[in-house]
Amino acid sequence: MEGVGGLWPWVLGLLSLPGVILGAPLASSCAGACGTSFPDGLTPEGTQASGDKDIPAINQGLILEETPESSFLIEGDIIRPSPFRLLSATSNKWPMGGSGVVEVPFLLSSKYDEPSRQVILEALAEFERSTCIRFVTYQDQRDFISIIPMYGCFSSVGRSGGMQVVSLAPTCLQKGRGIVLHELMHVLGFWHEHTRADRDRYIRVNWNEILPGFEINFIKSQSSNMLTPYDYSSVMHYGRLAFSRRGLPTITPLWAPSVHIGQRWNLSASDITRVLKLYGCSPSGPRPRGRGSHAHSTGRSPAPASLSLQRLLEALSAESRSPDPSGSSAGGQPVPAGPGESPHGWESPALKKLSAEASARQPQTLASSPRSRPGAGAPGVAQEQSWLAGVSTKPTVPSSEAGIQPVPVQGSPALPGGCVPRNHFKGMSED
């Protein structure tokens, strides 16, 4: 713990820099509006194209190779909590309001360009469609997140208190909203799937293939928020080559050796179920008593979409109609800038006892997850244009866990809806 204690003054100094407090990137890493071009000096990991790099490869430059155990990040993209490494998600949940929804205030840096803003807003809207989480505009709340384009993709786990940074560099947005969803799941209190306490039943960690010194990113957690069976298709799962030293797999699935892991397309069905279970709610509000997790339709007309969702959709629709979006506003609504002269500083999470771990069950795979399967009918990447044109206000209900069997996916599936890697944004050229 001595190394960690000596590190915190440096970390706090980093988070107090003007580029962080003002919700703007560091001047050396982002001049003007941060676009979606790949920064100079970054090289692909192994044979991966630069646009296909996942979180570990993007963040690798933030971790000192000589002493990776002293990094301010753990597990590749999580800001190290202090003084203890792992906490139960129930100790730092975001509070539920009287309306039965969980509001997470956010600030979006004005340094993002319009395509980048659209990707981030799409991720916020996906949570609102599928869960009781509502990302609302910051209005002097004590606890809030500040989304800024620093170097790398990282966040804290759960509500830390005061302002907490969510870094989404332009490279984190090149593959669409998947990495944004991943980091926001951290914000809501969830750790990585591949570090679950029961992970050894479902994956094998190939320690000899991990970059020397980076083994700390594969240590099993003691977090108790598993809540659902192991899910190979979770947006919280890292890919096979995470922190690979020579391009060979560091993670091997055991139940389905050829299954795709590390998808960054959308929330899986179990990702949604975890959010609903952790916060004790349904997609439209609190969980109905005596009727299970999801209430069925009563035949009445659906309630209007919430104001926050309407604002997000208006912004996205306006941008989709504009042939050349520019400026710092979207859909006639100004995009909030950084936190400015925020009176709130960084605070450590509260320490609580860990609750009992959920019993292990069979893992889910990409093929068995209706939301993560390419071309699936649930509102995800494949239906992006349909909900922009006219979104249904009836929330999507994730499939039941019962009867789900792990089915291996042969090879690497195509992106949903005909999406092309590294060409998510308007105007981006194919390399």
Curated annotation (Swiss-Prot):
Keyword vocabulary terms for this entry: Cell membrane, Cytoplasm, Cytoplasmic vesicle, Disulfide bond, Fertilization, Hydrolase, Membrane, Metal-binding, Metalloprotease, Protease, Signal, Zinc, Zymogen
Presence of keyword Lipid biosynthesis: no
Enzyme class label: hydrolase
EC number, as in UniProt: 3.4.-.-
InterPro entries: MetalloPept_cat_dom_sf, Peptidase_M12A, Peptidase_Metallo
Signal peptide (UniProt feature, chain positions): 1-23
Principal place of residence: cytoplasm
Biological process, per Gene Ontology: cell adhesion; fertilization; negative regulation of binding of sperm to zona pellucida; positive regulation of protein processing; prevention of polyspermy; proteolysis
Co-factor remark: Binds 1 zinc ion per subunit.
Pfam families associated with the record: Astacin
Protein name: Astacin-like metalloendopeptidase
Organism, as annotated: Homo sapiens (Human)
